[in-house]
From Swiss-Prot:
EC identifiers of the protein: 2.3.1.181
GO molecular function: lipoyl(octanoyl) transferase activity
Family affiliation: Belongs to the LipB family.
Coiled-coil portions: none
A GO CC term assigned to this protein in UniProt: cytoplasm
Pathway: Protein modification; protein lipoylation via endogenous pathway; protein N(6)-(lipoyl)lysine from octanoyl-[acyl-carrier-protein]: step 1/2
The organism of origin for this protein: Rickettsia rickettsii (strain Sheila Smith)
Keywords noted in UniProt: Acyltransferase, Cytoplasm, Transferase
BPL/LPL catalytic domain mapped to chain residues: 30-209
Name of the molecule in the record: Octanoyltransferase
Binding of substrate, residues: R69, G70, G71, K72, F73, T74, F75, H76, A143, I144, G145, G156, V157, A158
SUPFAM superfamilies the record matches: Class II aaRS and biotin synthetases
Amino acid sequence: MIRFITIPDFADYQVILKLMEDYVNKVINDHEPEIIYLVEHSEVYTAGTNYKQEELLNYGDIPVIYTGRGGKFTFHGPGQRVIYPILNLDSPNRYKDLKLYIKMLEEWIINSLNYFGIKAYIIKDKVGIWVKVRKDEFAKIAAIGVRVRKWVTYHGVAINISTDLSKFSGIIPCGLENSLVTSLNQLGIHVEMSEFDKIIQTEFNKIFK
């Protein structure tokens, strides 16, 4: 069974990035076991490899870090559960298929949200996980941005639990102008991070066998 490691407190993004990269190297070179980091970051904007500078609007005192993950700008901060799976897609029980991996991530998060009574969706040509907030109007509740090195995955998924959503106004989230963001709290679902973690671990084991 894959071990989930919860990082305490509000973690510095660059510290966690180095932690991930170091462990990816260990999986590749030393055949270390797969793990999943559960993180709650201190406030930071991060940019993926497809970012456009004009999508960074008004970041104030919040640091901006340019990363190697896929995607564009997003926000990380308190109240958001960030999940970093370090999985070896070139192992006997996996598939060397990045699109399939992302699809499995999406299914995992959708099923976890469904446990709390949230109907979540994938929208064609829009990355991430979405919920309907009004008729024909959707808001993003989870962002996805991954990278693979020698078929070992890192970076991952960020789910808004009780995140300060006003911080997303400093960017065009994921490059989608006029798109809405939401959280479990905003949808009326108040859950402790530890309770949410139990569900994502249970649902993970149903998808990634």
